[in-house]
Amino acid sequence: MFESFKQFLVDDLRINPDDITMEAELTQDLGINSLELADLVYTCEEKFNVEIDDDVLHTFKTVGDVVRFLESNS
């Protein structure tokens, strides 16, 4: 799941693959802004067949947070 999510970050958001680790913070380390976060949520919902509500979205601080959610819910 990590590799699939990492590839999305590289392909869609143009993030340097070397910067993407499980511990990398979405906003601080990867520079993802609110519009990109909305795109991230939409794409994850479509690609991984999950629903991410606002309450869950606010818990996503790191790449690992998103990956663990996707692993548990897809």
Q: What does each of the following model-derived ranges do?
A:
Residues E36:
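Two-component histidine kinase catalytic core, primarily the HATPase_c
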